[in-house]
Amino acid sequence: APPGFTPFRID
């Protein structure tokens, strides 16, 4: 996964 990837949505 790329840097800063998150499996959760962040608005």
Swiss-Prot record:
GO terms for biological process: defense response; vasodilation. Coiled coil: none annotated. Keywords: Amphibian defense peptide, G-protein coupled receptor impairing toxin, Secreted, Toxin, Vasoactive, Vasodilator. Expressed by the skin glands. Disulfide bonds: none annotated. Signal peptide: none annotated. GO terms for cellular component: extracellular region. It comes from the Eukaryota. GO terms for molecular function: toxin activity. It is found in: Secreted. Produces in vitro relaxation of rat arterial smooth muscle and constriction of intestinal smooth muscle. May target bradykinin receptors (BDKRB). Belongs to the bradykinin-related peptide family. This is [Ala1,Thr6,Asp11]-phyllokinin. It comes from Physalaemus signifer (Girard's dwarf frog).
